[in-house]
Amino acid sequence: IGRSFAIELAKRGGSVVCADINLEAAEETVTLLEQQGAKAFAMHCDVGNPEHVTHLAETAEILLSHPVTLVINNAGVGLGGKFDELSLEDWNWVMNINLWGVIHGCHAFVPKFKQLGYGAIINVASAASYTAAPEMSVYNVTKAGVLALSETLSAELRKFNIKVNVLCPTLVPTNIIKNGRIPGRYSKLADHALMNYAMTTSDAVATLTLNRLDRGQL
């Protein structure tokens, strides 16, 4: 979904900073954007590390030569398993990326948007934010947290002309399974679901979201 957003933003004339814990993946995205004639930069960033995200916020303005006006918090990982079989290390790993990563992103950019006088934040959650699929406890909790955070910030920051929205897509083919820690039996089920029951694509999600943002419907 992150790459799809970057490509769609480039199509609309946007300059993009692609931040990823996997720098090579970010650089691949930047190459695609540059082929479209877009101004794009790649940065290594572990969203679970607040210092990394603060550095991203400061450096992005320098790279772009203008303030950042849109932030998309998209990093996420998956983990399935029975609640009593998941370790606290598992919980910390998922929470640090899926929830704290979004908190860090918002915390780094909201003060800048207040100073600028406007801005937009799109947090990517999941339908798991409001459904309770069994054996997905840690994932469900993190996505519910992203939903709650986003709705709270939307109400709190509206008076500052800062728009905060949250996406809760259903099944969308992404790399979350490949990059997650999902036991084999769950991985096969997830792959089957994505292959056979995916209701949309990451490109469609990005296009629809940005269309609505451009029309002032978010």
Task: Name each model feature, range by range.
Residues 126:
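Residue(s) in the substrate-gating loop at a strand-loop-helix junction
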